[in-house]
Amino acid sequence: MKTVSVKEIYRQTEQYAGQSIRVEGWIRTLRASKAFGFIELNDGTFFKNIQIVFDEDLHNFSDVSKFTISSAIIIEGTLEITPGAKQPFEIKATNVELEAHSHKDYPLQKKRHTFEYLRQIAHLRPRSNAFSAVFRVRSIAAFAIHQFFQEKGFVYTHTPIVTGSDAEGAGEMFRVSTLDFKNIPLDEEQQVDFKKDFFGKETSLTVSGQLAAEAYALAFKKVYTFGPTFRAENSNTARHASEFWMIEPEIAFADLQDNMELAEDMLKYMIRYVMEQAPEELEFFNQFVDKGLIDRLNHVANSEFGKVTYTEAVKMLQESGEEFEYPVEWGHDLQTEHERYLTEKVFKKPVFVMDYPKDIKAFYMRMNDDNKTVAAMDLLVPGIGEIIGGSQREERLDVLTDRMKQMGLDEEEYWWYLELRKYGGVKHAGYGLGFERAIMYLTGMANIRDVISYPRTPKSAEF
């Protein structure tokens, strides 16, 4: 007898109606009386469960009636259409086998659990409705990203996780070392002698694949990375994690306008794809997590994104009459409250903020003609604020080295990056999308810890 997935049954119901089929999965709920019982079964292939009906004709009816939540079972039976019932169909069981027993102390019983509680059992939370939906959406969104770039002819590039350079110049990096902490070698100046370390130099976990991706963009024209990045930033907030995934495309022969166009196309593609492929999950989020979610996603997918310079945005905020927690001043980063005001109250749609002051942006961003601002952009979306950050990269070697000197960066450390400018270093641009923030936006989940399987945050690496 063919084993059929629950997803196949929901998607191709007519094909299996009246047929004898076999399903495998875990018990979500079970209730039984003296003569019959009902099992809600989930096999992991679909958000919804399938109902199994069993009665006293079953040879092991008494045993099945006592099966516990999360026990793994194999069902054989007939798929029956039930048009007048709560569920569209059910399986009338002819045989039920226990494959793996679940102890009675299984922590996910039939009640609503808080997200805080579920974080304490991160190894079991994918079995809950909310996290089943979150991680299926995450999978679908990841596929959408790859499909979008592959359809556009981008080369998927794998950049190093262990690096000897700081792509952001912020210094918030996790050290990678095999030195004996109890006997650390020192050099003549009594500093740590990293020449004795595994790589012969100071190394860290990457904060971004951008610099390495730029090298490949100057060979393949269009590339993207999609992988884990790490920030040793002691921010214990709902929006920050120490380990997260980044999507970082880089395009050669491109300026800031090309960059913004690509970012807009990518975000819309991802939203539309997830809405098409995960309607049940999004309906769940819309009902239980964020009641305006589907309307907001539709609005973003069908809006033409706005554009405003940083200087214009600051003026709008200062003249708004709104009382912000953080004062708005030219030369300071926009805070989340400022970003949300712009996208939710002023533009009422996603908006790109461009041309930021050079002093609040990274060394590699292209200097504008005013020598005060750089060709940088952030994409702000309603409900979250900044979701994508990017820039046109500085391709002029002399301007780039001057900027690095001003920022106190060691040119020797970036020798290979500077060399890219010597050998056909054409104008190019790119951006970064924090994947977890995208999943927060797609699902309405408010905490980054709830959209990554095993969150890594300050003082937390339990699993």
Curated annotation (Swiss-Prot):
It catalyses: tRNA(Asn) + L-asparagine + ATP = L-asparaginyl-tRNA(Asn) + AMP + diphosphate + H(+). It comes from the Bacteria. GO terms for cellular component: cytoplasm. SUPFAM superfamilies: Class II aaRS and biotin synthetases, Nucleic acid-binding proteins. Keywords: Aminoacyl-tRNA synthetase, ATP-binding, Cytoplasm, Ligase, Nucleotide-binding, Protein biosynthesis. It is found in: Cytoplasm. GO terms for molecular function: asparagine-tRNA ligase activity; ATP binding; catalytic activity, acting on a protein; nucleic acid binding; transferase activity. Its main location: cytoplasm. InterPro entries: Aa-tRNA-synt_II, aa-tRNA-synth_II, aa-tRNA-synth_II/BPL/LPL, Asn-tRNA-ligase, Asp/Asn-tRNA-synth_IIb, NA-bd_OB-fold, NA-bd_OB_tRNA. Its EC number is 6.1.1.22. It is an enzyme of class 6 (ligase). One of its GO terms (biological process) is asparaginyl-tRNA aminoacylation. Homodimer. Belongs to the class-II aminoacyl-tRNA synthetase family. This is Asparagine--tRNA ligase. It comes from Alkaliphilus metalliredigens (strain QYMF).
